[in-house]
Every structure is written in structure tokens, then in C-alpha cells.
């Protein structure tokens, strides 16, 4: 099932992380993980693009407030393959979210609106197996 999945009671607090495991469809053009208040307000929109919107093998991150996008941050690290398993960990620090990959690579994205905890998570384009918090 690569349809969207949403969790509305995530309650991810600073200092904790959420780990997402799944598999990337063989014909995947891109997949996204969103963390935030709700579907209109994202602290982080994490979009891995194999071939989407003119980006090839790029990670594009952004924030969204009241359905308005912020400024994009592009990353060169791209530890994903179509048809492969994926594991990504998102660690919420008050001022930033650290994105960690099973490859050992990591980068961070600034938190533009601090929340006491992150209630909302959604996935698009990924056949997910598990979502765990620690």
C-alpha cells in the first residue's frame, strides 16, 4: 500500500526520534514524510525525489505554515534506491530536526516554529512497514 498514511497522535517530544521503515516502490518518482501540527502546518516536509519536479536523486526539505510553503533546503546526500528497503530516523531537537539514515549520513533542518511536541506525521509514496518512536 503506497497510499498516504497519517498519524495524528504522534506526540514526538524534543530529544526523541521517530523511525520509519518501509520499502520504496520500484517505479517510485519520489516519497515524502511530513512532521508537524496537522496537514496544513509542517515543521518538516521531507521529500526524496528520484525524478520529480525537475530534481533527480535529491532530497528537498521545507516547512509549511497555514498551507504556505517556506524556503526549500536541498541536500546532496541521497542514500535511497527504487525497489529497496528504507529506514530514516527523524530526531526532534527544539531548534532543528536531525534526519539520520541507515547509511550513516545525516543532516538537519531548522525548526521555524517551535512546538512542545509534534502531533502529526504523514507519509506519501512509501510502502511503510513500521513507525516507532524512541
From Swiss-Prot:
Assembly, per entry: Homodimer.
Domain Galectin: 4-134
InterPro entries per UniProt: ConA-like_dom_sf, Galectin-like, Galectin_CRD
Job description of the protein: May regulate cell apoptosis and cell differentiation. Binds beta-galactoside and a wide array of complex carbohydrates.
SUPFAM superfamilies registered for this protein in UniProt: Concanavalin A-like lectins/glucanases (SSF49899)
GO CC annotations on file: extracellular space
Cellular compartment(s): Secreted, Extracellular space, Extracellular matrix
Signal sequence segment: none
SMART domains xrefs: Gal-bind_lectin (SM00908), GLECT (SM00276)
Positions bound to a beta-D-galactoside: 45-49, 53, 62, 69-72
Modified residues (N-acetylalanine): 1
Keywords for this protein: Acetylation, Extracellular matrix, Lectin, Secreted
PROSITE patterns (alphabetical): GALECTIN
Parts forming coiled coils: none
A GO molecular-function descriptor: lactose binding
Protein name: Galectin-1
Amino acid at each position: 500500500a503506497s497510499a498516504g498514511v497519517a498519524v495524528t497522535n504522534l506526540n514526538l517530544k524534543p530529544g526523541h526520534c521517530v523511525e520509519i521503515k518501509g520499502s520504496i516502490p520500484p517505479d517510485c518518482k519520489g516519497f515524502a514524510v511530513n512532521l508537524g501540527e496537522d496537514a496544513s502546518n509542517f515543521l518538516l516536509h521531507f521529500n526524496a525525489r528520484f525524478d520529480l519536479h525537475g530534481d533527480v536523486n535529491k532530497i528537498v526539505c521545507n516547512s509549511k505554515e497555514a498551507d504556505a510553503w517556506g524556503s526549500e533546503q536541498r541536500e546532496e546526500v541521497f542514500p535511497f534506491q527504487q525497489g529497496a528497503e528504507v529506514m530514516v530516523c527523524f530526531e526532534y531537537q527544539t531548534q532543528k530536526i536531525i534526519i539520520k539514515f541507515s547509511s550513516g549520513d545525516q543532516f538537519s533542518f531548522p525548526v521555524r516554529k517551535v512546538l512542545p511536541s509534534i502531533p502529526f506525521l504523514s507519509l506519501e509514496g512509501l510502502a511503510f512497514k513500521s513507525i516507532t518512536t524512541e
